[in-house]
């Protein structure tokens, strides 16, 4: 199933963003349920790649569970975080404030947050023209 205005998914190793072809410019990056099941380096790689490939006024959309003010928003998210860290100590539910610090280093600012079902969030980061 193909849409004319949406590119096919790109498989990328965000822990090695310098190895990714950055010749194309995109309007957005859609990232769903990745930040918490990846090394922190992948979050940094995501915004590094976004800086190189997203057009001015483009955005990065993140979906998944996040902490607010470095605290879990529910007991189920806290338990989920523990389970993730047992599987891999470099995984875990991230604080949105930590993600915001990384995004800002690469010229992206948090524009909007939406609470979603099952204690998840949609976070939209836009690329500042000054980045």
PLM region descriptions:
Residues 1-21:
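S-adenosyl-L-methionine
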Residues 37-53:
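A short, conserved alpha-helix within the catalytic core of class I
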Residues 27, 31-35, 63:
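Residues lining the SAM
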Residues 73-97:
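Conserved Class I S-adenosyl-L-methionine
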Residues 19-29:
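A short acidic, Gly/Pro-enriched loop at the edge of an enzyme's catalytic core
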Residues 106-131:
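Core SAM-dependent methyltransferase catalytic element
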Residues 37, 68-77:
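Mobile active-site "lid"/loop adjacent to the S-adenosyl-L-methionine
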Residues 56-69:
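Conserved beta-strand signature within the Rossmann-like core of class I S-adenosyl-L-methionine
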